[in-house]
């Protein structure tokens, strides 16, 4: 039976400077079946056998392991090609650690009009998909649908000439994956970006479960209109007006079997100790899961 299990996310560390080992121990101690981390963290800790022993000793598995595809869709060609050359070896490490998913992003803006950027992105995604073929690892690309961002984020985009709207919704992400005929490139579905881009439950139901690779869950303030949601002003699931039980239920019915990470960016949980943050994450999910007819375990 398909399950949606919680994984401890780096944003739940409350700014705490936890080591990789401390993070894994925290996940196990607070009842998370999984923990998110990067290959860089794992490699710094030790070889694959040592990392696997740590995970097993704490009763957790990898949720998401970052760092398999080390270039963006619109990175310079040499950088992109070099990154793809390393995919098989890096994916092999992910599998050796017990993982099967990694993350990435899809550009909200492009440096050229969408009609010109689209075929370039399709070609790049086809190559990314082919590079992952046979590795046992899928990548979830996160679209950014939230309408309002920090000034420094906007500056980062504009400084690179990225001023033309590109992919900003689940519908557009599905459209490009259909054109790619993707097998290994999927979606990181964040409830904030889904809701902030006028996403619908129907769109989720139309999404192949095999394409939903990762989940991020959070909520938005009830007194803030959809089109005014700020990416760095999220609140805990259940505190706002997102239809999260329906969201999870629809995702479950696609056949998705994987992990959901709490990602509450902004001041709401700033300064909360990692252990308290981890516990609060599970506490806020329980009533939502119950309403959706799902189990946390």
What would you call each of these model-derived segments?
Residues 1-100, 115-116, 122, 126, ...:
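N-terminal pre-domain/capping segments
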Residues 12-14, 39-43, 68-71, 106-110, ...:
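Active-site-proximal loop/turn and secondary-structure-junction residues that shape catalytic pockets
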Residues 12-15, 261-276:
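A short, acidic, flexible beta-alpha connecting loop/helix-capping segment that sits on the rim
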Residues 21-22, 34-35, 65, 127-241, ...:
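Acidic/histidine-rich catalytic cores of soluble enzymes
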Residues 37, 64-65, 95-106, 138-143, ...:
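Short beta-strand segments at enzyme active-site cores
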Residues 68-85, 106-120, 150-158, 227-235, ...:
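Surface-exposed, active-site-proximal loop segments in enzymatic domains
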Residues 211-213, 244, 256-262:
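A short pocket-lining beta-strand/turn micro-motif at the edge of beta-sheets
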Residues 239-253:
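A short, acidic, amphipathic alpha-helical segment used as a generic capping/interface helix at domain edges
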